[in-house]
């Protein structure tokens, strides 16, 4: 067995943080790497690691004239996405993980992990990656250290976080950090050849909420391996937020400037495939309005001394789904991707560029698909994997707001919730108070099947868009949101809105144009915040009057607008009947206030007859 004394680089730690140094030594003794490297985040380090990855066959450098300083990687076909069935919240008590998370006894899990991690880095380098989630020096930010045996993870963390020496200096000699251990689970014996994408068929993505630890084994894919992202910024941070009185949320942050020059910041939570990145990079079709991006995926929010809720984007990059991203849907994302990007599981063109479905209207005549095969438009499979990804610095976005790295954060005026609903849910509804807003967040769903006329399709609930990402019992999470509202100055809380861009006609036609025209809904929301936009009370909440929604310049039929801005009482009676089944999932821990909200909705619907 390799001892710590035999591991090259272990005794040259560039820090006097005793707990960190002891932890690195402990993991090195367990995993037995050939050497240890402390990452500084420098360009020289990035160049060295990308050269190493090219040599190993993991990366291909793209055409520098087309995509400067950009790289392509193809994963193992069995390692292409987050593995929710292998993701665990190992709280001390099972009930603290709740019914929506996988739980195993933490002592049992630790024993399993110790067995898997024993010797798992043999023949490899162990990289120590200090990183900061959020702007360096912000009171809203927090630090972490990831140990990994994947240089692909190191270069990706350099894009996605503030990584290296600045984060290590911020940590000082005794600062708090979240320890995150990652291994591909692919040790190399002496003389054994490596593969381009090492991984293991056994996978565990494990969180220990009480000790704020993350252990990930067997996967090299982003969400499972870049442990600052979902693992820390949502699962562990949501527990920290519960304990410390703040919010860690799966939300974009958007800066909106009205024609009068007034600025509002909006946070929005949508499940996957509901247009979050598109809204974060919105190009308004309304004349005089400007939209800028603060964040596209995660928001950390704390109350400021003035009583307002301030948000930072804890990430430094975008880790986006490539397919469906194009000039028609998200031109700002396309312009962000001019260079300094890592593409995973997209297709490659004959001239050393990348392509994916949705990038252009017509595909190239020939490609190399994500599995390395020749591809033509006649091929039966997509050229890019549906979950193909790009990793790119956020600062390259042409609409990035100057405030995106402000350590003070930005004050949030409104919070939006929404799913992909073909039926029932109006275009936009204002909650009269915070509690109704929490109720809206708790019932977010997307329709997974088409509905018959006058009925509702099968719903997949994703409350607050946090179902895969909440690090503790979701009923307690709802209670935390309610408590945050109760403790705050009610006059300074953000207003809450329930939006739905995806309403369809009975024939399956979208009623709302969406994309840049969603700025029209945001304009009404800003009007509500400023007291200038008219609304009408409904059993659900306040909807725009037809005259209050600015629809000049878009082709929308009068009856479609009527449908979008109406609460159909009979359909909502059906909708209300579906909520108890969802709530009963959470048992007795569900806050009574949400049952009260549900009962009040039923009463308002019955009174509306």
From Swiss-Prot:
Residues annotated for GTP binding in this entry: 273-278, 389, 420, 515-518
Gene Ontology MF terms: GTP binding; manganese ion binding; phosphoenolpyruvate carboxykinase (GTP) activity
Keyword field: Cytoplasm, Decarboxylase, Gluconeogenesis, GTP-binding, Lyase, Manganese, Metal-binding, Nucleotide-binding
InterPro entries, sorted: PEP_carboxykin_GTP_CS (IPR018091), PEP_carboxykinase_C (IPR013035), PEP_carboxykinase_GTP (IPR008209), PEP_carboxykinase_GTP_C (IPR035077), PEP_carboxykinase_GTP_N (IPR035078), PEP_carboxykinase_N (IPR008210)
Principal cellular location given in the protein's record: cytoplasm
Residues bound to substrate: 82, 221-223, 272, 387-389
PROSITE patterns registered for this protein in UniProt: PEPCK_GTP
Keyword Manganese assigned: yes
Highest taxon listed in the record's lineage: Bacteria
GO biological process entries: cellular response to glucose stimulus; gluconeogenesis; glycerol biosynthetic process from pyruvate; oxaloacetate metabolic process; propionate catabolic process; response to lipid; response to starvation
Enzyme class: lyase
UniProt: Mn(2+) binding residues: 230, 250, 297
Catalytic activity reported: oxaloacetate + GTP = phosphoenolpyruvate + GDP + CO2
Catalytic site: 274
Statement: the UniProt record of this protein carries the keyword Metal-binding: yes
Subcellular location: Cytoplasm
UniProt EC number: 4.1.1.32
Record HAMAP family: PEPCK_GTP
Record function comment: Catalyzes the conversion of oxaloacetate (OAA) to phosphoenolpyruvate (PEP), the rate-limiting step in the metabolic pathway that produces glucose from lactate and other precursors derived from the citric acid cycle.
Name under which the protein is recorded: Phosphoenolpyruvate carboxykinase [GTP]
The organism of origin for this protein: Frankia casuarinae (strain DSM 45818 / CECT 9043 / HFP020203 / CcI3)
Gene: pckG
């Amino acid at each position: 067995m390799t001892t710590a004394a035999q591991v090259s680089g272990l005794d040259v730690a560039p820090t006097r943080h005793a707990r960190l140094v002891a932890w690195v030594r402990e993991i090195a003794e367990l995993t037995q790497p050939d050497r240890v490297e402390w990452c500084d985040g420098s360009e020289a380090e990035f160049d060295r690691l990308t050269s190493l990855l090219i040599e190993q066959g993991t990366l291909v450098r793209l055409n520098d004239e087309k995509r400067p300083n950009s790289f392509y990687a193809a994963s193992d076909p069995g390692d292409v996405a987050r593995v929710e069935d292998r993701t665990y919240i190992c709280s001390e008590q099972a009930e603290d993980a709740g019914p929506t998370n996988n739980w195993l006894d933490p002592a049992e899990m630790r024993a399993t992990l110790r067995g898997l991690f024993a010797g798992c880095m043999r023949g490899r380098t162990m990289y120590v990656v200090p990183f900061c989630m959020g702007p360096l020096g912000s009171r809203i930010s927090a630090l972490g250290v990831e140990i990994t045996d994947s240089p692909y993870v190191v270069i990706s963390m350099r894009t996605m976080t503030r990584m290296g020496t600045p984060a290590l200096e911020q940590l000082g000699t005794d600062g708090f950090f979240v320890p995150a251990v990652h291994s591909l689970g692919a040790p190399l014996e002496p003389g054994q050849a490596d593969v381009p994408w090492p991984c293991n068929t056994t996978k565990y993505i494990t969180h220990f909420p009480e000790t704020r630890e993350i252990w990930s084994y067997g996967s090299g894919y982003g969400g499972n391996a870049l442990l600052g992202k979902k693992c820390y910024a949502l699962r562990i941070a949501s527990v920290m937020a519960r304990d410390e009185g703040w919010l860690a949320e799966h939300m974009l942050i958007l800066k909106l400037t009205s024609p009068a020059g007034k600025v509002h910041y909006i946070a929005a939570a949508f499940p996957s495939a509901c247009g979050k990145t598109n809204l974060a990079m919105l190009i308004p079709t309304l004349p005089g309005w400007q939209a800028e991006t603060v964040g596209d995926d995660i928001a950390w929010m704390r109350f400021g001394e003035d009583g307002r809720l301030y948000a930072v984007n804890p990430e430094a990059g975008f880790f986006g789904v490539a397919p469906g991203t194009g000039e028609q849907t998200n031109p700002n994302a396309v312009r962000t991707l001019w260079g300094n990007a890592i593409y995973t599981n997209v297709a490659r063109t004959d001239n050393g560029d990348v392509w994916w479905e949705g990038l252009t209207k017509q595909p190239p005549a020939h490609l190399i698909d994500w599995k390395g095969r020749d591809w033509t438009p006649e091929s039966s499979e997509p050229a890019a994997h549906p979950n193909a990804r790009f990793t790119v610095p956020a600062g390259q976005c042409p609409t990035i707001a100057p405030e995106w790295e402000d350590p003070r954060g930005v004050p949030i005026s409104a919070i939006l919730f929404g799913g992909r609903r073909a039926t029932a849910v109006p275009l936009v509804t204002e909650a009269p108070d915070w509690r109704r807003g929490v109720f809206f967040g708790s019932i977010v769903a997307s329709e997974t099947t088409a509905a018959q006329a006058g009925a509702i399709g099968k719903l997949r609930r994703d409350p607050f868009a946090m179902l895969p990402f909440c690090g503790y019992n979701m009923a307690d999470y709802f209670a935390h949101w309610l408590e945050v509202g109760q403790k705050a100055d009610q006059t300074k809380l953000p207003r809450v809105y329930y939006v739905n861009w995806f309403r369809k006609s009975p024939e399956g036609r979208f009623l709302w144009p969406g994309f840049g025209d969603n700025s029209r809904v945001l304009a009404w929301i800003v009007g509500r915040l400023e007291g200038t936009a008219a609304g009408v009370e409904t059993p659900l909440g306040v909807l725009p009057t037809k005259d209050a929604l600015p629809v000049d310049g878009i082709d929308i039929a009068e009856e479609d607008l009527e449908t979008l801005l109406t609460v159909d009482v009979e359909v909502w009676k059906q909708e209300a009947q579906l909520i108890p089944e969802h709530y009963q999932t959470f048992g007795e821990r569900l806050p009574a206030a949400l049952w009260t909200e549900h009962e009040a909705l039923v009463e308002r619907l019955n009174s509306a007859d």
